[in-house]
């Protein structure tokens, strides 16, 4: 008994063990027999207070109070929902349905001895639960107005009999259960309609949807939003329309190509050509007024008095930017006049060029140009050469220095009369001495010029002598080379005696021979001629004149 008392499955119906909290609660619910709660199915409730306990579309048989298992409870709920949905189509033929062995089993002990009594199966005559596809077909046929006898014709005859039995067993006066999905849909529908009504008070042009059913989670209509079609009207069209939202696709171009820029410039050029001269001048005058607003962002500071006058602001900006040309305020006041349009265009060109070369946080950066570069730019602009421009610059610098010296001398000169007389005397003496010095300088200069001419003449004579000497040296070298060649030929000659071969080799001359060497060579040649006179006659060589 102890083991049976501990195990909940081995408990007998007559056992006096305490019930669990769950069992007590479910027995209490089964005794109340609330129709909305379909969790418990009491059987054969014959109490005087409740003569007939039942859930809609399900009759309770005479049996002991017990609990259903979850699977059996789910099957019973599906059958009850099926009966409630089909009760409106087929009128009931019988008022009540007999029990037909519809007793539910208690969740009693699971021992083999009690299992044969408790586990009762559902008979085959019980109607099976319908599928979702069949329920959808029933709904469509109901909306289209088709007779209820069309659907059973598509099933087996056995199913038709079961349906006819199930239709007859449900009275039409019983309340039909509502599905949880429909309840949630109705609640969501009410909240959506309330929200839409509150948001569409100020929007008179927006039309509310025909029905509150929508598959979108958007509660407030947005741009490009379209309400979906009512699902009740989907069967009217051959093809169902998808419940989707249509939104516009915006094509943003992040990169601008050269072709696009060229087209835009052509459009701007065409528009400018269409305008008259007066319109262009008005446009330029407006641009001059608006350009002043950009100057503070590029390092220009305006005074307090010039904040309301763009002309004064423009003049101050040009002064700070070191504009070199002439500026007239009347040009800025009437920039569209024919006299001022050219000057205004030059001003705009200068200001826009300065605005382009900015650095950092909106500060304008002026190019650093040296004095030499400035002179070169001016020379290139005027077309004159750099030398002329440099001379002019030097001349101007000399003038400035001379003025400074004169001012300094005037500041140093005393103002007393005695000093003035002394200055006159010194000026006279200084002038006479200066004249003498000038005469002496002229004489010396003349003498120096004469000496220079003499030196120049002497240098010319020296250069001529050098040329002649070079020519003589060259001729002497040629003569010495020819003499040496002839002596070598005589040494190689067979006619001469062998004892004179040594003398012949000594007759050669150097490049710079002296007079003594020349006289010796002449004497040696005379001896050689005398010794070989007979041989020379055989060769028909005439002796030199004056020789024997």
Swiss-Prot record:
Its GO CC terms? kinetochore; perinuclear region of cytoplasm; spindle microtubule
List, alphabetically, the Gene3D superfamilies matched: Ncd80 complex, Ncd80 subunit
Instruction: State the residue spans of region: Important for kinetochore and microtubule localization.
Output: 100-253
Please report, in chain numbering, the residue ranges of the motif SXIP motif 2.
168-171
Q: Where is the composition biased (Basic and acidic residues)?
A: 20-29, 104-116, 127-141, 156-165
Q: Which residues form a coiled coil?
A: 386-457
InterPro entries for the chain: Ndc80_sf (IPR038273)
For the region CH (calponin-homology)-like region, which is not required for kinetochore and microtubule localization, give the residue spans: 237-372
Q: What UniProt keywords apply to this chain's record, in alphabetical order?
A: Centromere, Chromosome, Coiled coil, Cytoplasm, Cytoskeleton, Kinetochore
State the name under which the record lists this protein.
Answer: Kinetochore and Eb1-associated basic protein
- Organism from which the protein derives: Drosophila melanogaster (Fruit fly)
